């Protein structure tokens, strides 16, 4: 076997007949498979042991030679070579075809490669190959032309006219092979290149296509005639197995049936040719053989597919590769692994951040080899076999050994669907009773897991390296931040939030208010003995609390609550005392208003201070982020565990319950509803009188009900009582939101009909009052639509993620600095008045490209090529700087990846990104994972704001990444200049906008309903939109440059996600958009040897021109091309990656003709061939590290040890 980690690239080509015979271990001459009586393979049949190897390890067919002793000997009785049975997966056979047969991939593909090579139409080829017409191969002296088609009748007429032997014309693939052999590639290419200089239009396109194919053959060293087969390879039998079922029947792979048809027809053809049968019979048999081979290679590509039992089309060789069930996606990219298990998950509230509970039964099976080795090592079992028996009997001493084996051996937990890298994390196993895996409650958010029956898979890293990697890189305690936005992903939820909220509540006049304590311990004693309540406002001496107080806060008394003293006791030292949920308190210090002098009257002080709101979920997230910023991973995960324990403990003590009496009643609800009814009546009257259109009426009515619902909601918020359990759950962020609350206590409001339109009849009741039958019926519409939408959305979002991963999987951080001199100018992203993404968020964690100066003083805030920290970003914003030039992925010069400086920090760690980080995959996951949170709908605004439907949500994201023409397209100006006039034309209901540039004037026609974005006299740059809508990016690319398009697309993606409340770091979107603009289309090839119209990678294009310029030749010119992500994935340089994505046969056909070489730069192609991936620790620079000279002198160490032993 080849060591897969040693080879550097993989090449594909067309197999020559000699090569096929060289691969083969013998010819398959008979269609037989196995003998039905002896169950042994037939000789010279499809399962022959002499050709394909023995069925049993180290044993020949007749059983004369048995054992490894006879390795590689050939038995003289049965002729089988003694070797392993695995050779039946590797050894090929062949069939010598009685007539040449065309390969359907090259004849049928689009464009037909055979047709281009011969300059014949695919239709003409089909007529010749399937024996409908003759083709003239050599016209000799006659007036026929080479490659001319003749029907049977014309052929006979020409023979009569010119006499036998006066010209050569043939039928079938044989004729095509002769023609292909006649093609002189070099001569053809030279002639076509000459012709290319003069022609235009369709002819030019055709010549470029032909040149493309011919030069591909010339470069790759494939011969044109190899597209026609003389020998057919037979794949190894274990890849097309035949297995016996219980009833003595056999189940077999479809390929065996297809091969049998080929062999039968081939043998019949041989016999007919030996008998000198009439030509017409032989021709028919040849045609049948051609069809049989076509079906074997690609069933259904031509004509009706051949079906097996039950009208099911047979799976041909091509189908074995294609699709989700094909070889690529099912077996190469989606292998099942040993040392794994799955079970239902249950909550493990007592676990630490880095632990998970593993059922003993599961662990004993997973760790079996380790336990067995340990049993032998500890001499509890004589040998491995005895140890195995012990483990299977589950002897008592096995469990003790298991405890030691499991200790500090991390396991991986994975929950499907794995939408981002946090869907697989490492934990240290803790053995537990029961059968469910226990999961830490804080890890749920990353997995999107809950305990309503979810299952998770567990995997065991085996090697030392794998364990080290799992522990250092994948341990759950390390994954505090979410890679998509750098915010904490492990935030407390539900009970934990509720407990901490309850703990930090304040109430006036609770028992023991105004007591002053010396230490936190005193506070706790007082609380336990019932002198004070958790919510009681008290005073405590600041010096007893180990916190960073300011000068004038020391030796004073802090006014706080009992609960907050407890809450602050778990916060890491060095953090301010948190007394109110504000950022100032969190980042700098406690507010001075909460302090009093020792002699002051605390009752008076308390009267002057309002009660402070408790700490909600969002604020707990801010605390975690701040702790992480200051103390990094370990301290944060310890704090998180303390926060979790405290939250659970306090919510248990609080014991919140919910009863119907807890749902408040809005006193004047009926007044609000009556007013709405009256308003609707007025609107209907106006409509009846013809004052408003039906659309306007509909919008007004739905508007009225929306307002009614909102005013009820407002009333509820104003009157809410913070001690109400439902309000506490909602306000704290533990469960539910205002909309759920208003459905319980206000009104349910408007519902969507099945067609997605909102119904005018609202549901006036709420759940407390109960719904009428009709209202219940209406509300089921909305509920069902919600369910179906979610299901559809999940599938759509998953497919989007798959395409994104495919296009960016080879983007890896490859070097420290690419040394580019270009940058990206960034500012706030806003739509009209609404802020989408502020400059501050775009700056943090990026490198500058130019120094930033203070606009007023002119002093330098930060130099060139420096990392912008949060503090510096804050300074830049405070200095009122509007634009900053930063290093960006868009302008990075690193080929096949990005450099550290252009990428910035790794959002998941908050530190500089490391070389080897697979940023492409992370970017794809970051964009794809929140895809399910985006809406599905394209909004029908019902003719209010604009006539066009604005696409939003998931469809808009797809539209952007697939570079489609957007719905509701905005017209852009192609010249820079002044808007000279906007003229309305009442007759055609249009407006004409005239833009006057320096050299030319353009006018654009827009509809009356379109919202204008420009006004008369305004100066605009080319590419600026004239009306509201989405710009078509391909058009923008023609008018402006690539960087403008990239910037526009980045803004559009951010708008779509942020409008739904999803935050994603710019850099992820930059990575994806850069992949869409990686290619250049050659416009003029200069003196290089590329063809005009070729697509090239930017880096290859630059290298090509560099060489041309160094040799003093004319460089090629090209223009950037914007490709959708699907097309970009298929245009990748790696044929393995492209073939495993989509259109497998097309990709492979093309790659074979070009003799493409895959340099295995991406992740996917390495996974396919089973090589370690070139990212992270698998990167070349990390794998070949020579250890430094042995610094410790080993013998000396040993001597010291022996001395201590003796002493």
From Swiss-Prot:
Free-text cofactor note: Binds 1 Mg(2+) ion per subunit. Binds 2 Zn(2+) ions per subunit.
One annotated Gene Ontology cellular component of this protein: DNA-directed RNA polymerase complex
SUPFAM superfamilies: beta and beta-prime subunits of DNA dependent RNA-polymerase
UniProt EC number: 2.7.7.6
GO biological process terms held by the UniProt record: DNA-templated transcription
CDD domains: RNAP_beta'_C, RNAP_beta'_N
GO molecular function terms attached to this record: DNA binding; DNA-directed RNA polymerase activity; magnesium ion binding; zinc ion binding
InterPro entries (alphabetical): DNA-dir_RpoC_beta_prime, DNA-dir_RpoC_beta_prime_bact, RNA_pol_asu, RNA_pol_N, RNA_pol_Rpb1_1, RNA_pol_Rpb1_3, RNA_pol_Rpb1_3_sf, RNA_pol_Rpb1_4
Top-rank taxon: Bacteria
Record has Electron transport as a keyword: no
Reactions it catalyzes: RNA(n) + a ribonucleoside 5'-triphosphate = RNA(n+1) + diphosphate
Binding site for Zn(2+) 2: 818, 892, 899, 902
Function: DNA-dependent RNA polymerase catalyzes the transcription of DNA into RNA using the four ribonucleoside triphosphates as substrates.
Similarity remark: Belongs to the RNA polymerase beta' chain family.
NCBIfam families: rpoC_TIGR
Protein name: DNA-directed RNA polymerase subunit beta'
Organism: Lactococcus lactis subsp. cremoris (strain MG1363)
Gene name linked to the record: rpoC
């Amino acid at each position: 076997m080849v060591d897969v980690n040693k080879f550097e690239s993989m090449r594909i080509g067309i197999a020559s007949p000699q090569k096929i015979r060289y691969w083969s271990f013998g010819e398959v001459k008979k269609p037989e498979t196995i003998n039905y009586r002896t169950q042994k393979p037939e000789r010279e049949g499809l399962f022959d042991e002499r050709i394909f190897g023995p069925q049993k390890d180290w044993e020949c067919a007749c059983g004369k030679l048995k054992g490894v002793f006879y390795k590689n000997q050939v038995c003289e009785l049965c002729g089988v070579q003694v070797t392993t049975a695995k050779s039946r997966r590797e050894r090929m056979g062949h069939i010598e075809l009685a007539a040449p047969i065309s390969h359907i991939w090259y004849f049928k593909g689009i464009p037909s490669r055979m047709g281009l090579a011969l300059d014949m139409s695919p239709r003409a080829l089909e007529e010749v190959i399937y024996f409908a017409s003759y083709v003239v191969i050599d016209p000799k002296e006659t007036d026929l032309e080479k490659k001319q088609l003749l029907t049977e009748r014309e052929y006979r007429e020409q023979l009569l006219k010119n006499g036998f032997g006066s010209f050569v014309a043939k039928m079938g693939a044989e004729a095509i092979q002769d023609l292909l052999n006649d093609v002189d590639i070099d001569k053809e290419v030279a002639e076509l290149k000459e012709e290319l200089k003069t022609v235009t239009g369709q002819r030019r396109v055709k010549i470029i296509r032909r040149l493309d194919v011919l030069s591909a053959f010339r470069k790759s060293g494939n011969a044109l005639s190899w597209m026609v087969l003389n020998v057919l390879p037979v794949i190894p039998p274990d890849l097309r197995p035949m297995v016996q079922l219980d009833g003595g029947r056999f189940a077999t792979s479809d390929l065996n049936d297809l091969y049998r048809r080929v062999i039968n027809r081939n043998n019949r053809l041989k016999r007919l040719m030996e008998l000198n049968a009439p030509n017409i019979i032989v021709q028919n048999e040849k045609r049948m053989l051609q069809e049989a081979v076509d079906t074997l290679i690609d069933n259904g590509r031509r004509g009706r597919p051949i079906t097996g039992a039950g009208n099911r089309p047979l799976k041909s060789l091509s189908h074995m590769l294609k699709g989700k069930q094909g070889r690529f996606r099912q077996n190469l990219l989606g292998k099942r692994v040993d040392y794994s298990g799955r079970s239902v998950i249950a909550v493990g509230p007592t676990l630490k951040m880095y632990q998970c509970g593993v059922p003993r039964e599961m662990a004993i099976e997973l760790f079996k080899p380790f336990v067995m080795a340990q049993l032998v090592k500890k001499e509890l079992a004589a040998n491995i076999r005895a140890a195995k028996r012990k483990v299977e009997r589950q002897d008592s001493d096995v469990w003790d050994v298991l405890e030691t084996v499991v200790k500090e051996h991390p396991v991986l937990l994975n929950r499907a669907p794995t939408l981002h890298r946090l869907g697989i994390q490492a934990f240290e196993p803790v053995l537990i009773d029961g059968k469910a895996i226990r999961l830490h409650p804080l890890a749920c958010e990353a997995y999107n897991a809950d305990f309503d029956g979810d299952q998770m898979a567990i995997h065991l890293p085996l090697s030392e390296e794998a364990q080290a990697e799992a522990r250092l890189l994948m341990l759950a305690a390390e994954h505090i931040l979410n890679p998509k936005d750098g915010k904490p992903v492990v935030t407390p939820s539900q009970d934990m939030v509720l407990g901490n909220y309850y703990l930090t509540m304040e109430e006036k006049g609770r028992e023991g208010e105004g007591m002053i304590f010396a230490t936190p311990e005193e506070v706790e004693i007082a609380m336990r003995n019932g002198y004070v309540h958790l919510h009681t406002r008290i005073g405590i001496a600041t010096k007893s609390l180990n916190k960073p107080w300011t000068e004038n806060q020391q030796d004073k008394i802090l006014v706080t609550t009992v609960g907050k003293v407890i809450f602050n006791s778990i916060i890491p030292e060095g953090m301010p005392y948190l007394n109110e949920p504000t950022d100032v308190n969190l980042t700098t210090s406690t507010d001075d208003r909460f302090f009093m002098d020792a002699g002051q009257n605390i009752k008076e002080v308390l009267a002057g201070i309002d009660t402070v709101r408790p700490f909600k979920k969002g604020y707990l997230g801010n605390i975690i982020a701040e702790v992480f910023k200051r103390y990094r991973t370990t301290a944060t995960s310890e704090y998180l565990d303390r926060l979790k324990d405290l939250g659970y403990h306090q919510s248990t003590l609080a014991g919140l319950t919910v009863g119907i009496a807890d749902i408040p009643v809005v006193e004047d609800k009926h007044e609000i509803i009556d007013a709405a009814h009256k308003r609707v009546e007025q609107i209907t009257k106006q409509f009846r009188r013809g004052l408003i259109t039906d659309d306007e009426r509909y919008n007004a009515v739905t508007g009225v009900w929306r307002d009614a619902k909102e005013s009820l909601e407002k009333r509820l918020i104003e009157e809410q009582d913070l001690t109400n359990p439902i309000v506490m759950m909602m306000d704290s962020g533990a469960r539910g939101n205002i909309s759920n609350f208003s459905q319980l206590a206000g009104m349910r409001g408007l519902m969507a009909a099945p067609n997605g339109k909102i119904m005018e009849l609202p549901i006036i009741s709420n759940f407390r009052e109960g719904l009428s039958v009709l209202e219940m019926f209406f509300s089921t519409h909305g509920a069902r639509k919600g369910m179906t939408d979610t299901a559809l959305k999940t599938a759509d979002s998953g497919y989007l993620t798959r395409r994104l991963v495919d296009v960016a999987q080879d983007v890896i951080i490859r070097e420290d600095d690419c040394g580019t001199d270009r940058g990206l100018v960034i500012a706030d992203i806003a739509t009209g008045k609404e802020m989408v993404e502020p400059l501050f968020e775009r700056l943090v964690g990026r490198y500058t490209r130019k120094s930033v100066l203070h606009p007023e003083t002119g002093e330098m805030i930060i130099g060139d090529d420096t990392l912008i920290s949060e503090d510096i970003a804050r300074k830049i914003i405070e200095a009122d700087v509007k634009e900053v030039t930063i290093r960006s992925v868009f302008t990075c010069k690193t080929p096949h990846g990005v450099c550290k400086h252009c990428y910035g920090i790794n959002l998941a760690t908050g530190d500089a990104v490391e070389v080897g980080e697979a940023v492409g995959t992370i970017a794809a996951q970051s964009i794809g994972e929140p895809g399910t949170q985006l809406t599905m709908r394209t909004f029908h605004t019902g003719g209010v704001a604009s006539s066009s439907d604005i696409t939003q949500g998931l469809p808009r994201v797809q539209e952007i990444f697939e570079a489609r023409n957007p719905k509701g397209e905005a017209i852009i100006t192609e010249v820079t200049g002044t808007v000279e006039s906007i003229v309305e034309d009442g007759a055609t209901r249009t407006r004409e906008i005239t833009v006057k540039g320096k050299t030319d004037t353009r006018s654009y026609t827009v509809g009356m309903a379109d919202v204008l974005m420009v006004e008369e006299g305004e100066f605009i740059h080319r590419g600026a939109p004239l009306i509201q809508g989405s710009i078509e990016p391909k058009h923008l690319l023609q008018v402006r440059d690539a960087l403008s398009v990239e910037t526009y697309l980045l803004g559009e993606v951010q708008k779509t996600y942020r409008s739904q409340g999803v935050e994603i770091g710019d850099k992820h979107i930059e990575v994806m958009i850069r992949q869409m603009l990686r290619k250049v289309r050659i416009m003029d090839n200069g003196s290089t040897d590329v063809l005009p119209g070729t697509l090239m990678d930017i880096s290859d294009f630059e290298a090509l021109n560099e060489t041309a310029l160094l040799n003093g030749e004319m460089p090629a010119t090209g223009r950037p091309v914007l490709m959708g992500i699907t097309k970009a994935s298929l245009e990748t340089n790696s044929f393995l990656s492209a073939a495993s994505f989509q259109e497998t046969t097309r990709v492979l056909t093309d790659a074979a003709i070009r003799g493409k070489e895959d340099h295995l730069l991406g992740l996917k192609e390495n996974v396919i061939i089973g090589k370690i991936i070139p990212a992270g620790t698998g990167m070349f620079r990390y794998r070949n590290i020579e250890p430094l000279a042995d610094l410790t002198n080993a013998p000396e160490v040993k001597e010291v040890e022996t001395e201590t032993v003796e002493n």
